[in-house]
Amino acid sequence: MATYAVGDIQGCYRALKLLLKKVKFNADNDHLWVAGDLVNRGPESLKSLRYIKKLGPSATLVLGNHDLHLLAHAYGVRTLNPKDTLAPILTAKDSDELLEWLQAQPLLHYDAEFDAVLVHAGIPPIWSIENALNYALEVEQALSTTQTAAAFFVDMYGNQPDVWQPSLEGTARLRLITNYLTRMRFCSPTGKLELQTKNAPSLPPTGFAPWYTHKHNKWGNTKILFGHWAALMGETRSKQFIGLDTGCVWGGALTMMRLEDGQFFAVDCPC
């Protein structure tokens, strides 16, 4: 029995199947963590979504920004742009079932056995792990009914507010929580977000640094596994912060880590 954590699949179903074959993944005994962005940009988002859903309790998915983007489309808040590859999901015969399942997935997962967190983008240095779990739950509760989810998606998009205040309320609070957990790359020591820059951490915008490089006494030794940042190519220079996005959909590789021993596995992406 083994637990594997995989980076951004983004509709690259063939690469996912090749990687699972490489590690001899057995859904009856093994467990797969998916670091968000299961869909979009790649050619087989529908197959990817169906497969992870079919794994049932053998898979744990946290939502990424592209997954939320799909749900926003489904609620009529956004229209598809030429780069999106989501139309086959929205028109599939099992679309409602797939989207209902996706909407019920968490934004953050903590496993006490491994003392490890799975999140799409990261956790701001001003939050503890407990804070992050509780704040993620606020968004998950907003997604828990059709009425509250519709209101959430209407106001989800935007870069403001860009720094955390416990007094934040309503849609502004939920938007910032979502941006931290699903979009963050660079932030300041006080958690101020910079969401425009997507390049490698060696070229940070002035006053900002990769979120995981700031002082984080509240996290102890908890490992944080994340995706989202393809430009990192998995290099965080830390054993505590595990970057899993190695740019599969951009011609890189699909990467996973076995949590029991920290061993990495990868396949070139035929996406």
UniProtKB/Swiss-Prot annotation:
Gene3D superfamilies: 3.60.21.10. It catalyses: P(1),P(4)-bis(5'-adenosyl) tetraphosphate + H2O = 2 ADP + 2 H(+). Keywords: Hydrolase. One of its GO terms (molecular function) is bis(5'-nucleosyl)-tetraphosphatase (symmetrical) activity. Its EC number is 3.6.1.41. InterPro entries: ApaH (IPR004617), Calcineurin-like_PHP_ApaH (IPR004843), Metallo-depent_PP-like (IPR029052). Belongs to the Ap4A hydrolase family. Hydrolyzes diadenosine 5',5'''-P1,P4-tetraphosphate to yield ADP. PANTHER family: CYTOCHROME C5, PTHR40942. This is Bis(5'-nucleosyl)-tetraphosphatase, symmetrical. It comes from Saccharophagus degradans (strain 2-40 / ATCC 43961 / DSM 17024). The gene is apaH.
